[in-house]
């Protein structure tokens, strides 16, 4: 065989399959097919569904429905009830039903005291907490990265400070509580610097980056392409390079797509009205291979670890896939 790659099944620990509630955007079944076509055999679905995955029963619903799908699907439970940011869910019971981590993804936990409590509870069941790292007051009505390009386009900006301030807070809370903290979709140089510094003294901190933050910079938005309207936003070329360097030196542990499908109506509209998010499961490996292997010269084997063994370790999944008697992926 030529121009073929044999690798362990890829794992994406950050996807949005929209079921229950928005099956017009994606279902577990259609999301599974997208994942499988991209080489993924295992995914973790975020809880911002309708209703959210905030009860043991909702976690069990995902687990049972996932048995009909061609890949492994693991639910991530909501940290707070209805993702309201104030009332903690029954994390222990949800974990017993199969929740592999906890997050209010899409709705950052603004209350530092609540984030502390969530981290403390997570230590009891030894699972990571994943907080969408944006200060909502600093983010305000930002539609893209705040900078020269946003000024030229006349679009409200979302400063990198909105991310880095929240990342710094969460890192401090993780060190204080001794909990496992996973930082999703890192997008800025400042956030990378905070993570790098904390990881030198706290091995329980992990981080991910998306293919689109590695591939694009904010100049790509000059066409007002709503497919590139994501949260956190695609930032400057300096930020993009900092993310690549963070992958190279291990500051960033894995790649996750933040696969977030929408309807055509949600995207084929004006930039200010378009929904945040883009799909990524099917294009992930191609984009990552282009940026990290072809452009940056990383070894393919090391890049595959970012998509397989590293996310397995973050979530505590079985690593031994090839011994006799194990289920190969």
Where are these regions (language model features)?
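Divalent metal-coordination and catalytic microenvironments
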Residues: 3, 14, 35, 39, ...
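Metal-associated gating/positioning segment near the N- to mid-region
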Residues: 4-66
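Divalent metal-binding segments
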Residues: 16-26, 44-56, 76-88, 104-114, ...
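Short, surface-exposed connector motifs at secondary-structure boundaries
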Residues: 39-44, 70-74, 98-101, 173-181, ...
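Acidic (Asp/Glu)-rich catalytic clusters
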Residues: 62-68, 91-96
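Histidine/acidic residue-rich metal-binding segments in metalloenzymes
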Residues: 88-255
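His/Asp/Glu-enriched, well-ordered alpha-helical/loop segment
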Residues: 152-180, 227, 248, 253-255, ...
